[in-house]
């Protein structure tokens, strides 16, 4: 008989009366009146093994096993006695009567129980091998595998070719920091790990591969958050001779296919499309969570002439904004709730949080409860009530500052209230999945520190055809042929139509204050390739980690990556990064400089 004939979790009634050989880990061992029960676990689940004392050698071995011992069991599959069936297990109607038990490897006492749900992340990541044995982690990583398989199936059916691009490439520091790799052979020179395969996939389109994809690692040396890692995985795609709408349709179908085949979710037949300007106006975010039924009301123009300087000053400032957020039935929020929200928005740079409770709208000013009403004239109050559509029992929150602060703070408040217990109880948030496309992004953003425009996405995104003239006259007016797929407030994919003409690419570089010499030094290979009949092309990249995190309902992408880094970009399992010896540094022509000590 083979070492293993079945997986533990797949032993069911169809094997009744058969002898099986199982391998796995002792999940739990129980001694009940001379009979030993072992819950044996493998990647497919659990099965109950019964060890009778009739077989002395086997029973002695069973007495010695403990949690996480790796064992082999041979035995007879039989039905469980009446009253002992476990409906919560796939194998819950049967058990295996053990004939032979072999300890393949003993285990020291684990630092935690695998069913302990209150472990710190530090403990879990330090002992990641044991953490990965937990059923939830097994589920998450197998879900990740299925998502990748379904993406490959779809792309293969659509004629895409899986082509690998280099991991050691050229540093082009436009955006996040590169991870640099010193060259031993070329002293003083460095490779960079790719932030994306962007330029190589464009070159593959010029090279006539027409449709490319790969599921690949990318690297960015940036500060980490719950949805960030220094190395992450993209489903990276590029295609020739398709327009923006056709590209969106193609990959919208892919995401629908993946969700249906992996978790049985039918996403909308057509994803709504929202311009960037509308998303910012209504939600203060370019990745709006459409499950939350709260929206901004624009008040900037109505607050220009009020005596209340908190509102009028930003209303009359070039980059200022005044916006309101009406919360239906929010009148029942306590002063403690409001104070908590006030502290919350300070995280996003807001100086405070103005509010008005609408007790009886018909009474006008007298029907309102607020510390700011006395500072507003009747026309302003009427405009606020009219524009927000406020009803009796509502509360209206206000933000007035630079537009970025208003968008960030009021946008975060919108999500916090919507997803709160209050929001759920009052129907302010829907369950389910709410995808959309956000389009027509600004081509450039102005960087005050550098006193120049920078690319909002990357410098290879094509401007809209009707905005080409602005590249040389008014870059700030340029909109891009860029598109992001957003799902429940997360950007899961982003892409664009690319620039395929060398003269347009050179104009974009000039708009970014990248001169001809610098452009040739950094991107000469691309500019040269674009001169050889480069086809119109575009593409998209999806964050595999993010998609699986959402599907699994996980708290962090670290829960869907086998060996992730911490928020300090460290691997607690291997203790990477770590020092290297002097000989290695000499071979790489590197001398370390001691970090400066803080002054006393």
From Swiss-Prot:
Assigned EC number: 6.1.1.23
Enzyme class: ligase
Residues given in the record as L-aspartate binding sites: 174, 220, 457, 498
Intracellular or extracellular location(s): Cytoplasm
Recorded GO CC terms: cytoplasm
Catalytic reaction(s) noted: tRNA(Asx) + L-aspartate + ATP = L-aspartyl-tRNA(Asx) + AMP + diphosphate
UniProt record, GO biological process: aspartyl-tRNA aminoacylation
A Pfam family matched in the record: GAD
Gene Ontology molecular-function annotations: aspartate-tRNA ligase activity; aspartate-tRNA(Asn) ligase activity; ATP binding; nucleic acid binding
Annotated site, Important for tRNA non-discrimination, chain positions: 32, 83
Keywords noted in UniProt: Aminoacyl-tRNA synthetase, ATP-binding, Cytoplasm, Ligase, Nucleotide-binding, Protein biosynthesis
Major localization class: cytoplasm
PROSITE patterns the record matches: AA_TRNA_LIGASE_II (PS50862)
Gene3D superfamilies on file: Bira Bifunctional Protein, Domain 2, GAD-like domain, Nucleic acid-binding proteins
Family of this protein: Belongs to the class-II aminoacyl-tRNA synthetase family. Type 1 subfamily.
Task of the protein: Aspartyl-tRNA synthetase with relaxed tRNA specificity since it is able to aspartylate not only its cognate tRNA(Asp) but also tRNA(Asn). Reaction proceeds in two steps: L-aspartate is first activated by ATP to form Asp-AMP and then transferred to the acceptor end of tRNA(Asp/Asn).
Subunit comment: Homodimer.
Protein name: Aspartate--tRNA(Asp/Asn) ligase
Originating gene: aspS
């Amino acid at each position: 008989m083979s070492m293993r004939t079945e997986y533990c979790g797949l032993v069911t009634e169809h094997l009744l009366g058969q002898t099986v050989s199982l391998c796995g880990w002792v999940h739990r061992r129980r001694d009940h009146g001379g009979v030993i029960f072992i819950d044996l676990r493998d990647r497919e689940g659990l099965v109950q093994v019964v060890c009778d004392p009739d077989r002395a050698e086997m029973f002695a071995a069973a007495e010695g096993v403990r949690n996480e011992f790796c064992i082999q069991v041979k035995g007879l599959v039989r039905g469980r006695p009446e009253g002992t069936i476990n409906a919560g297990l796939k194998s819950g109607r049967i058990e295996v009567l053990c004939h032979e038990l072999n300890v393949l490897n003993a285990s020291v006492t684990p630092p935690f129980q695998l069913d302990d749900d209150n472990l710190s992340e530090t403990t879990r990541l330090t002992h990641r091998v044991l953490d990965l044995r937990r059923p939830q982690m097994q589920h998450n990583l197998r879900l990740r595998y299925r998502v990748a398989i379904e993406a490959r199936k779809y792309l293969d059916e659509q004629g895409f070719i899986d082509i690998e691009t280099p991991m050691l490439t050229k540093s082009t520091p436009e955006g996040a920091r590169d991870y640099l790799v010193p060259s031993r052979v070329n002293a003083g020179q460095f490779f960079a790990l790719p932030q994306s395969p962007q330029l190589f996939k464009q070159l593959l389109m010029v090279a006539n591969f027409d449709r490319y994809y790969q599921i690949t690692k990318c690297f960015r040396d940036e500060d980490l958050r719950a949805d960030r890692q220094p190395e992450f995985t993209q489903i990276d795609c590029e295609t020739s001779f398709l327009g923006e709408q056709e590209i969106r349709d193609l990959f919208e179908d892919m995401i629908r296919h993946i969700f249906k085949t992996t978790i049985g979710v039918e996403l909308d037949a057509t994803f709504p499309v929202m311009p960037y300007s509308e998303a910012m106006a209504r939600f203060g975010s370019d990745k709006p969570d459409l499950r939350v039924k709260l929206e901004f009301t624009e008040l900037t123009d109505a607050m220009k002439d009020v005596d209340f300087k908190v509102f009028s000053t930003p209303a009359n400032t070039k980059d200022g904004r005044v916006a309101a957020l009406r919360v239906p039935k929010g009148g029942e929020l306590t002063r403690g709730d409001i104070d908590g929200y006030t502290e919350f928005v300070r995280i996003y740079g807001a100086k405070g949080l103005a509010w008005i409770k609408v007790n009886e709208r018909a009474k006008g000013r007298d029907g309102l409860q607020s510390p700011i009403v006395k500072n507003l004239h009747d026309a302003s109050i009427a405009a606020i009530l009219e524009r927000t559509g406020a009803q009796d029992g509502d509360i209206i929150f206000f933000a007035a500052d630079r537009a970025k602060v208003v968008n960030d703070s009021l946008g975060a408040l919108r999500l916090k209230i919507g997803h709160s217990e209050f929001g759920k109880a009052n129907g302010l948030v829907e369950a389910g999945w709410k995808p959309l496309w956000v389009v027509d992004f600004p081509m450039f953003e102005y960087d005050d520190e550098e006193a120049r425009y920078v690319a909002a996405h990357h410098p290879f995104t094509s401007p809209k055809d009707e905005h080409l003239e602005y590249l040389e006259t008014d870059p700030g007016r340029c909109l891009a042929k860029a598109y992001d797929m957003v799902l429940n407030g997360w950007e899961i994919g982003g892409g664009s139509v690319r620039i395929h003409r060398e003269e347009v690419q050179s104009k974009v570089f000039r708009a970014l204050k990248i001169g001809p010499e610098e452009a040739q030094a950094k991107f000469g290979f691309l500019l040269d390739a674009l001169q050889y009949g480069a086809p119109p092309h575009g593409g998209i990249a999806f964050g595999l980690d993010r998609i699986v995190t959402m599907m699994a309902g996980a708290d962090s992408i670290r829960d869907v990556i086998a060996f992730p880094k911490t928020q300090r970009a460290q691997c607690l399992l291997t203790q990477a990064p770590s020092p290297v010896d002097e000989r290695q540094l000499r071979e790489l022509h590197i001398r370390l400089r001691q970090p400066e000590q803080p002054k006393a």
